[in-house]
Amino acid sequence: MTHILALNGSPRRNGNTETVLNAFLRGAEEAGATCETIRLSSLTFKNCLGCNACHKKGVCVITDALTEVFEKVMACDILVLASPIYSMTVTAEMKGFIDRGQFLWAQKFKTQTLVFDEEHLKNHIGVFLSTSGQGLPIMFDAAFPVVRALFNDAGFSYTENVLFAGMDEHGGVKAWPESVEEALTRGKELVQRVNEP
């Protein structure tokens, strides 16, 4: 059975991002997936120290709430990184999480103990789900390479963007029910594609 881990980087409860994320996961569950959501803002964790200790042994010297989160990341089939756009990129919560993934990069390129073959990448999907207040066509551009870095280091094929721009213009997700419907459909269709023989 396909297992989805969703990391919610929004500091707001029941806002635009959390609402469309919940709809996406509801659609995924309707297609047979199991889902778990972790709100990064509810966790206590330190930011990357930039100490480069992981470059030697491939292990982060910090042990905190993110230690277990990364274990779950490496065990799931689909990883959803959900974040609203703050100052043209992901939130501080999401960026802090991604920065802590430096040890995965170190395992791939320094200690060379982490290798993903084509079969693994085929069966592990990365999804970026995001909302923005403004509707400019460049709203998500700075966030794409940030989330791609984590997906690449953790062994996920980054193939899916679920994006909703112009939330302010629409009056937010509560006044834009089509966004919820689209998110639900996207979640359902993704799991159906993954489960195709």
Model-derived features with residue positions:
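Glycine-rich phosphate/pyrophosphate-binding loop and the adjoining helix
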Residues: 30-31, 138, 144-197
